[in-house]
C-alpha cells in the first residue's frame, strides 16, 4: 500500500474513526478481530478484512490490501491470527497516526469524545436511533435489524427523555459498563 496516498484518504475521512492504540485497547481489539472473523475460525482472511472495511465505508484496493496483509500472515497460515492482526494494527497506527496519542491526548475523556463522535454521524452533538442503527449495521451487528429495538437502546440511556443521547448520557452509560476480567 502506498502510505502517502492512504494518509491523504484517511485525512479526508471523518476524524472520528481512527485505528489508535489509546482508544483501542486489547479487549476492544479482540472484539474487532472477532467481528472481522466472520466464520469464527480464528483467522481473518484478506477477503474478510476487505469486506469488514467496506462495511465501515473504508474501501481499500484489494491488491494493495492483500500485499500489506500478506506480509503479516505467518507461513502456512490462511489468514491473520489475533497476534498478527494486533501487529498490523500497531504498524498502521504508527504509519498513519504517528503512534500512541498523536491525535488526541489519550485521556479517558478524549477517548469517550472520540467514541461518541463515531456514533454522532451528523455532528449535531446527539446520537439518534437512526445514527445508532447505521453504525450497528456497519459493524454487522444483529441489533441493527429493527429500528424499534434500536429506539429501546436509546431510551435505556436517555435520562432527559428527549429521544436521543447526548455526550453526558453516553459518558454515564460508558462509565457503568462492566468489562469482564
Swiss-Prot record:
It comes from the Eukaryota. GO terms for biological process: response to calcium ion. The keyword Thylakoid does not apply. Transmembrane segments: none annotated. GO terms for cellular component: cytosol; nucleus. Ca(2+) 3 binds at residues 158, 160, 162, 164, 169. Induction: In leaves by infection with the bacterial pathogen P.syringae. Ca(2+) 2 binds at residues 120, 122, 124, 131. PROSITE patterns: EF_HAND_1 (PS00018), EF_HAND_2 (PS50222). Gene3D superfamilies: EF-hand (1.10.238.10). Ca(2+) 1 binds at residues 37, 39, 41, 48. PANTHER family: CALCIUM BINDING PROTEIN. This is Probable calcium-binding protein CML43. It comes from Arabidopsis thaliana.
